[in-house]
Amino acid sequence: MNLKELERWPRQHDIKNHELFGTEHFGTEAPCVVYELKPVIDPKGNPVPGCNTAWVTLNNPAQFNSYTTEMVKGVIAGMQKASADRTVVACIFTGTGSDAFCTGGNTKEYAEYYSMNGTEYGYYMDLFNAMVDGILNCKKPVICRVNGMRVAGGQEIGLACDLAISSDLAIFGQAGPRHGSAPVGGSCDFLPAFMTAEQAMWSCVSCEMWSAYKMQNVGMITKAVPVLKVDGKFIRNPSVITDAYVQDGAIVYGENKTGDAAAEAKAIRKTATVDFSLLDAEVNKIVYTFTNLFPNCLMMSIDGIRAKKKFFWDQSKLPNRHWLVANMQSEAYLGFNAFNNKKATGKDVIDFVKYRQLLNDKAPYTTEFFEAVMAPPKDK
């Protein structure tokens, strides 16, 4: 076969379609998942013919890109569609807007549909597990483009990705123990692979939010990139201390400013504009690197590293699914409903001290128990 015959080969032969899904799980109107192909960009800014990126975008900005049941299906479909597309070099997993990549499951849906309905939540968790599996099994590299806060379940699906490039405005952390759940959708499995056991422990249980620079420092993301512009020039996130310093004998980096410095930084952020061009340039740089590697050797290498993540994830995802079903009848009901009712009550958490006191007195879970620990409406 000569070169001209080889170039005509695809046009002369039928190519089988290995995609499981069409476009039925994607949309354009929030809440939804948006799926689109974009060309790979070379270092000179030119599109590379025949080479694309698949963008899987969580589109629910009004609720900080929290994923509904239908959106979970969209992520599963997006990962499989990217896997089966011969033109796709890498999958870019991101969110709409500049506030959030994802804040996890949709708390309104959790509170109003799944709480006190554990069996239904079990079906939902089967989909959630398939979403994490879909990311870990995608046959293209998955880059998490962190356009804003990556919290709770958003942190977990982000950790399942292969690499993360983040806006330096983003914050990272868990919310489960504060809001009625536990970070058993991946964080308990993945965080010890990124940081020390004690750092992973504190991140999981404290619900403390860490900056993108701190995440880069502990090795949890590849790079934090400035996205704020003042007078046409990029500046680093003014709310974060981005120079290393010594505190109590330890080197500290990426901590949030406090007091007057925090107030000054907040004022700067109000006048600045958000521009993701540097963030996207970093994503393009990684994708172009992938484009210039043998694709099967690339995926063998990635799957070899993913296997370590998958080992721990596969050990725990099914027992965790069953625990979450049971938990939806108790603490999850309280946590999700407290968060969902915060506009009416002014508080997004229960009275934890009262809750512990009632448990100490062996009080049964009843309607009266729940009412005793939930914040009353503000007008009462």
How should these model regions be labeled?
Residues 56, 75, 93, 157-158, ...:
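Hydrophobic alpha-helical segments that mediate membrane insertion or helix-helix packing
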Residues 1-52, 86, 98, 211-213, ...:
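C-terminal alpha-helix plus adjacent terminal tail
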Residues 49-59, 73-116, 133-144, 163, ...:
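A structural preference for short, pocket-lining loop segments at secondary-structure junctions
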Residues 64-67:
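Short amphipathic alpha-helices within nucleic acid-binding modules
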Residues 134-295:
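Crotonase-fold acyl-CoA enzyme core
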Residues 5-27, 95-131, 150, 178-180, ...:
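Glycine- (often His-adjacent) and acidic-residue-rich active-site loop
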Residues 71-75, 124-127, 279-282:
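Hydrophobic alpha-helical membrane-association signature
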